[in-house]
Amino acid sequence: MTAALTGRADARGTMRPRTLACTADGIWLWPGTPLTERRGAALVPLPTPHLYQHVATLHGPAVHAAALARVIERAAACLDRGRLEEADRVLAAVLLPPVSFDGAALMQAIGRRLGVSVPDVEIAGWPSASPPALFEQLARVHDRKLAVALTLEPIFNPDLQRIAPANVPFDPLVHPRWPAGQPDGGQFRPRDGDAIVPVQWQGPAVRVAARFLARLWRLLRRLPKLPEPREPEPPPPRSEPAPPEPPARAPESGEEKPPGVGHNRPPEDGAGPTPDEVENSPVPGNPGAGHDQPFTLPVERPTGEGEVAQWGQRAADKIREALKNNDTKRLTEIADALAHADWIKEQLDNIIAAQDPPRSLDELIEAAQEGGRRFGYDNHHIIEQGPQNGDVPPNVIDAPYNLARIPRYKHWQINKYYGQPQSECEGLTPREYLKGKSVEQRYQFGLAVLRKFGVLK
Amino acid sequence: MTSRNYSEMSDEELAKAFVEISVSEADAIGLGKVRTMRKLFDQLRALKETLRARGPEARRVLVPFLSYSPPSASIFADQAAQVRLNAARELLAVVPEQARAALEDLAANGPSAQSGRAGMCLQFLEDGVFKPT
């Protein structure tokens, strides 16, 4: 048994490979998951349930959430005072269980995918029945962290620092590198002003999210079933209920993805479904369906990106309905379903942001002007970008009053609405319907859409 | 299913096809398949025109769909809501009060995609832009 298990700090202290590290800008979990957020000048730890959720992904459910939160808080306080080395020492002494076998498998998959070194940390436990392909799928969630992961790599793997000048702490935010796969991959790149600002927990969704995640947290903290003493096959399966059928409809190849950030553009025209597609489209018999049936999610990740987002939006709708009805039983059931589907976790920010109540236009506009990222939110152009509004002056499209920060799922819904023919638009899409209308009419239409989709008061 | 064989179908068969297309439409919306949404809209329009061509009473076959709520294990909430939404839009001139009530209920309580669409439909009605026939 080693230091990690007994709680004794490793003799190498901050120079040992590890999964927690800090820079002047925050505290990070390998490969680059932020555990703090910046509020003004202060660094604030993420809420304890979220800290636990992140760290337990690698270290297993035995992570002591309260102790972890205390250490992160102490380290963040050190960073606030500019004491980077002291913060590093605090983190190095954190009592974490060894990385679980599943955590290690996930780390290997992430390392391969991002091209970063995996810290040589202690591993303990026993393998689960999860297929290797599952870890490859889960690793995709970390793709967006590539640049951060590359810059933090020498901190999580101190041996790599030997190539740096002696006694000079490596600061990835001062010396960022271009990510692998680019022509200059691995080379230092200029600093940019778009620092990562993980602020998932700001905004009106906080109260709802806190309630929701408090339930999710308790479910996630349930210890996995251990093997019976005399059972020859020890590893228990990670997910328990019989896998429901996949969603009603499998995605087609070349499937369109839900619209992303800042697009607000009309889709390209092209071939639609064949008659067979329509004939074979969703039919009764879908598990997880309906309002008085238990809410379930597929155990395995659905094969298409569009499907993952679709499940996420269904979950968001169910949560909103349960919150509206103050149905705690339903909420617990949904949290349980989410806790057992690892693949949906990449959607949690979107699901929580979708619970935002309508806000005033000033709030939406001000939020868009704040800059930085908000996980679960997008900036939405009230008069859309794109050729359909090519006759609108660019200074109007880009004006602050035309840009609102809204929950990502709502953004996607609105964009899909704009691209779908509507009976009330004489069979035209709203984009087509608005052509030739005045700028003021288009803006008012955009506001009406925001109101009706529950974004604007 | 194509518009070509709608004319050969009974009202009840058309009603069944109406549900199938609406359910597919809900999925196309959920999956962000914009081209599919357009195709399904065209199919639904052809179906509705077939019903309309059979006289004012034929459309009443859609009235039960204003409160469409099949056995819950068989369908997702957004799929059922899309059936209600499409039926309500088509029945505004036939059973205006019932259809409007369905739209208002969807706008207030429906899944986000259908809620927004129902709300916008009501907005077009209030503005006098949409005149159901």
Predicted segments with their positions:
Chain B
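HEAT-repeat alpha-solenoid elements in large eukaryotic scaffold proteins
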Residues: 16-45, 77
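Hydrophobic core positions within HEAT/HEAT-like alpha-solenoid repeats
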Residues: 63, 87-89, 119
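Short inter-helical turns and helix N-cap capping residues of alpha-solenoid HEAT/ARM repeat scaffolds
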Residues: 79-80, 110-111
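Positions within ordered alpha-helical repeat solenoids
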Residues: 20, 24, 53, 93, ...
